[in-house]
C-alpha cells in the first residue's frame, strides 16, 4: 500500500507541475522580458493567435 501511495503522489505532482509550467510561461515577467524581441512575430504565427486580438494588446504594450 505504501508503494502505491507513493507512486500516485508523484504522478499527480508531475501533472500539476506540467500545468503550472505552461501557465507560468505567459505570466512570468522574466521570460517575457527576455523574449520580447521575438515573441511578437513568432507567437502570432507559431501558436495561431488571432492577429487582430494580439496586435491590439501588443501595440498598446510595446
UniProtKB/Swiss-Prot annotation:
InterPro entries referenced in this protein's UniProt entry, alphabetically: Protamine_P1
Positions of the UniProt region annotated as Disordered: 1-62
Tissue-by-tissue expression: Testis.
GO cellular component: nucleosome; nucleus
Keywords, sorted A to Z: Chromosome, Developmental protein, Differentiation, DNA condensation, DNA-binding, Nucleosome core, Nucleus, Spermatogenesis
Primary site of residence: nucleus
Coiled-coil features, chain-numbered ranges: none
Annotated TM spans: none
UniProt function note: Protamines substitute for histones in the chromatin of sperm during the haploid phase of spermatogenesis. They compact sperm DNA into a highly condensed, stable and inactive complex.
Record's protein name: Sperm protamine P1
Species assigned in the record: Antechinomys laniger
Amino acid at each position: 500500500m505504501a508503494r502505491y501511495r507513493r507512486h500516485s503522489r508523484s504522478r499527480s505532482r508531475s501533472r500539476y507541475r506540467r500545468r503550472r509550467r505552461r501557465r507560468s510561461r505567459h505570466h512570468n515577467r522574466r521570460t517575457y522580458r527576455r523574449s520580447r524581441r521575438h515573441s511578437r512575430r513568432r507567437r502570432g504565427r507559431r501558436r495561431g493567435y488571432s492577429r487582430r486580438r494580439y496586435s491590439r494588446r501588443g501595440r498598446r504594450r510595446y
